Every structure is written in structure tokens, then in C-alpha cells.
């Protein structure tokens, strides 16, 4: 299996599990706060590190990576500063990246094993 990676994979990001995103957003909607605020995770990871986590979860020994250095890779590092949301809404993410990826992987495994499953919905970016 080969995975296309835009850039060298060393760019860092923070990811937020959907349940945490919904909880933070609902808490914001229910509050009186009306200024911009970050709802995110403090857990920062490189794309290469995330691929390694996915390899471990999936049981794949090592995916071949096709580093596409000519593709846009965005900023070198991006992470959410969540100090304000913690202070104003008393909210913080709960789901660690590894746990969220495992839940997502398990869900996709169930969905793709169903007879007549439309696999293309999992392969588009």
C-alpha cells in the first residue's frame, strides 16, 4: 500500500475528534460568549507521526510513502491555542488522537465490511 503525503510529512497539526468538536461548539452556542474562540486539541503531531499511529492501529507494518514535495504543504506547524476556551467555557478536548483514530478505524472497518458498501466514500480527499 502507498500513501501520498503532500510535502515531507514533518509539518505538524492538531486534530480534534468529532464528538469533542460538537461538545465544544454546543457549549459555545449555549453561552453568552460572542467573540472568536478556538475549539481544538493541544495534542500536536507531525503527519509522519500520525501515519505511524495509523500503521500501528491497522496492523500494517509500514506503508510506503509517496512524498509529493511539489504539492502545497501549508504552514510548517499549526496548533490550536485553547487557553481562552478553557477559561471562558471551561471546555477542553477529551479524546486523545490515538484513541480517536482507533475509534474511527474500527468504525470504517465495520462500514466497509457491509455487503454493498460504497467504498468510494472512504477514498476521496
What is each PLM-predicted segment?
Residues 1-125:
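C-terminal substrate-binding subdomain of Rossmann-fold SDR/epimerase-dehydratase oxidoreductases
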Amino acid at each position: 500500500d502507498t500513501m501520498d503525503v503532500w510535502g515531507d510529512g514533518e509539518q505538524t497539526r492538531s486534530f480534534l475528534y468529532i464528538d469533542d468538536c460538537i461538545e465544544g461548539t454546543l457549549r459555545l452556542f449555549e453561552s453568552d460568549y460572542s467573540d472568536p474562540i478556538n475549539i481544538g486539541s493541544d495534542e500536536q503531531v507531525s503527519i509522519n507521526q500520525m501515519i505511524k499511529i495509523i500503521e500501528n492501529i491497522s496492523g500494517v507494518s509500514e506503508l510506503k510513502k509517496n512524498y509529493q514535495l511539489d504539492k502545497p504543504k501549508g504552514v510548517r506547524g499549526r496548533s490550536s491555542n485553547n487557553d481562552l476556551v478553557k477559561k471562558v467555557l471551561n471546555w477542553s478536548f477529551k479524546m486523545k488522537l490515538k484513541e480517536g483514530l482507533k475509534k474511527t478505524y474500527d468504525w470504517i472497518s465495520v462500514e466497509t465490511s457491509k455487503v454493498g458498501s460504497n467504498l468510494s466514500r472512504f477514498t476521496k480527499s
